[in-house]
From Swiss-Prot:
Source species: Shewanella baltica (strain OS155 / ATCC BAA-1091)
Chain's gene name: gltX
GO MF, any single term: ATP binding
Protein name according to UniProt: Glutamate--tRNA ligase
Lineage, opening ranks: Bacteria, Pseudomonadati, Pseudomonadota, Gammaproteobacteria, Alteromonadales
Protein task: Catalyzes the attachment of glutamate to tRNA(Glu) in a two-step reaction: glutamate is first activated by ATP to form Glu-AMP and then transferred to the acceptor end of tRNA(Glu).
Gene Ontology CC entries for this record: cytosol
Length: 469
């Protein structure tokens, strides 16, 4: 039997990291077993579902590279199918119409609460004969009485629920709209889902869904309920812990490889290995290796992984993701080096692509002023002679190459009998406007000959003015 999994988010908000991890685990379960992965949008909550949220979910999945084989399916486009099954269940007696008013249900719950009883429907309409009336009604599933529902969860082991603890679930509201728990069952059945991977908050839904599947004569899928993600303070992860939307991480400068690597390790492990490519994830992933304890989100670990991938992935690939940040920061690339060359130069120091983009501006744009603190420290009177001499040596170069530039800087220090720092720091501030950059040879090479010479002249003028003031 072909393994078939699904990711079924509700479009009531953006794709958050908890949902992304569930999607990743479900995707890996399919890919690790040469199976199929289905994307389904569970939009039966019509009032809260939005197109913007749906678009954001698809954008997040595409950015992460979690491709799907079927879908996206939308539940709101399948209402005819759900109503067809409900009609069959009413005819077979596995569902019934409930005419209890809201007032009666509220009074029942209040009485049960006052008596310390579990709050559930009492089956008032369960065995009543059919009515020919215009009274409003809901449709309820006739849950089995007695016995229990047992399933073996890939993460949590054997789980058992007493049927007597379950009430007769509403499967269609008074307006005729089918409910979430019912739609999920029909969808999983129709789509041939063999393994359901979802959050632990759905555990209580599982016995109800299994009972409906049994009533329909449908196969029961396997289940894996993964634990929630906590903030570093032990509380449930929320906006106050920082970015929680997947695309916010894109905006903050993280690579999808870093986020995927971080998320897969947030509850799953393979020995002591920390770095996993997608291919390695597919090779090693098993649902049974997921830890059932909650996992704490650690931003420092994510930053570390992001640094690793910025440095280790092909510069040309990193540049495709960096392009978004260059556009976002309005850095015009038309007058400067190839972006992949800048990635190669700056990758060693960069924590995020957002930082990398900001620190690359001087390769493409001239700066109006030198950093005040750096100029005060390095563009003093003693910098005049080194700047003038290095300018002469650079101007004399036949070829503008990294090697030739390096030799010119080194020759300047030798001729003046000073350390490289006495030449390098004033030169760095001169050409970048700041105090940090990659090696000066590659920095000047990427900035270009004409622009480098202009900036050195500007720095010489700045130092001369300070001497004369």
């Amino acid at each position: 039997m072909t393994t078939k999994t699904r990711f079924a988010p509700s479009p009531t908000g953006f794709l958050h990291v908890g949902g992304a991890r569930t999607a990743l685990y479900s995707w890996l379960q399919a890919r690790a077993n040469n199976g199929e992965f289905v994307l389904r949008i569970e939009d039966t909550d019509i009032e809260r579902s939005t197109q913007a949220a749906c678009d954001a979910i698809l954008e997040g999945m595409n950015w992460l590279g979690l491709t799907w084989d079927e879908g996206p399916y939308y539940q709101t486009k399948r209402f005819d199918r759900y109503n067809e099954i409900i009609a069959q269940m009413l005819a077979k007696g596995t569902a019934y119409k409930c005419y209890c008013s809201r007032e009666r249900i509220d009074a029942l719950r209040e009485a049960q609460a006052a008596n310390g009883e579990a709050q559930k429907y009492d089956g008032c309409c369960r065995d009543l004969p059919a009515r020919d009336t215009d009274e409003p009604f809901v449709v309820r599933f006739k849950n089995p009485i007695g016995g229990s529902v047992v399933f073996d969860d890939h993460v949590r082991g054997r789980i058992e629920f007493s049927n007597d603890a379950l009430d007769d679930l509403i499967i269609a509201r008074t307006d005729g709209v089918p409910t979430y728990n019912f739609c999920v069952v029909v969808d999983d059945w129709d789509m041939g889902i063999t393994c359901v991977v979802r959050g632990e908050d759905h555990i209580n839904n599982t016995p109800r869904q299994i009972n409906i599947l049994k009533a329909l004569g449908a196969p029961i899928p396997e289940y894996a309920h993964v634990s929630m993600i906590l903030g570093d303070d032990g509380a449930k992860l929320s906006k106050r812990h920082g970015a929680v939307s997947v695309m916010q991480y894109r905006d903050d400068g993280y690579l999808p490889e870093a986020l995927l690597n971080y998320l897969v390790r947030l509850g799953w492990s393979h020995g002591d290995q920390e770095i996993f490519s997608l291919e390695e994830m597919k090779q090693y992933f098993k649902l049974g290796d997921i830890n059932k304890a909650a996992s704490a989100f650690n931003t420092d670990k994510l930053v570390w992984l992001n640094q690793h991938y910025i440095k280790s992935l092909a510069p040309e690939y990193v540049a495709t993701h960096l392009q978004w940040h260059m556009d976002d920061q309005e850095i015009d690339l038309s007058n400067g080096p190839a972006l992949a060359e800048v990635v190669t130069a700056l990758a060693e120091r960069a924590k995020t692509l957002k930082e990398l983009a900001a620190s690359s501006r001087y390769f493409y744009e001239d700066f109006a002023e030198f950093d005040e603190a750096q100029a005060k420290k390095h563009l003093r009177g003693v910098a005049l002679e080194p700047l003038q001499l290095v300018q002469q040596k650079l101007a004399a170069l036949t070829d503008w190459t990294v090697e030739a530039i390096h030799q010119a800087i080194e020759d300047t220090a030798t001729e003046l009998d000073v350390g490289m720092g006495k030449v390098g720091m004033p030169l760095r501030v001169a050409v970048t406007g700041a105090g940090q950059s990659p090696g000066l040879d590659i920095t000047l090479f990427l900035i270009g000959r004409s622009r480098s010479e202009q900036r050195i002249s500007k720095a010489i003028e700045f130092v001369a003015d300070r001497i004369n003031s």
